[in-house]
Amino acid sequence: MAEKGVKVLGMWASPMVIRVEWALRLKGVEYEYVDEDLANKSADLLRHNPVTKKVPVLVHDGKPVAESTIIVEYIDEVWKGGYPIMPGDPYERAQARFWARFAEDKCNAALYPIFTATGEAQRKAVHEAQQCLKTLETALEGKKFFGGDAVGYLDIVVGWFAHWLPVIEEVTGASVVTHEELPLMKAWFGRFLALDVVKAALPDRDRLLAANKARREQLLSA
């Protein structure tokens, strides 16, 4: 039985949705998950997020919260007694938010052209993405996780890289996160994906691979 009033409106292949699931699982919160067909959005989704009409949406006691990073912070604030997601120190919290925003604004944008480009354009996109990830990697120096000795807010925000990027690399033939170029990031991939709470929420890799292959073919033929 899911905890009263806790529901996640998501989409199985969305790396933004999995952030919410990881946060809830780390906190030990049971929830109902509703997988949305984004080509035919449900009345529930449109009612709970009429502004952007996007997933994820967390519905808690009938009140909707949208946008994945905002939802993760909300979860940490509501279920205070569980696993700490945000750092306790104000400065460390600010740093975590800074790097999360950097990853959202810069790294995500740098990675997308790899998926949509070929040839020289793709090689340029790979280089630019690697430079962005190298900057992000500095936040890992001397640490096991971005959160320190344990997974924290920034790990949750960028955690999708560990599962989705290898899929994107296979689909596109590009090599982005390598031991040579991004050794700390590559090692973190392994540590992060080894965690039971992380693995439990991951979408099936073969299904994700097939979906991304189909999507890329569609984009390249457009």
UniProtKB/Swiss-Prot annotation:
Main enzyme class: transferase
The enzyme's E.C. designation: 2.5.1.18
Protein's UniProt name: Glutathione transferase GST 23
Gene Ontology molecular-function annotations: glutathione transferase activity
Reaction catalysed by this enzyme: RX + glutathione = an S-substituted glutathione + a halide anion + H(+)
Keywords of the record: Plant defense, Transferase
Domain of life per record: Eukaryota
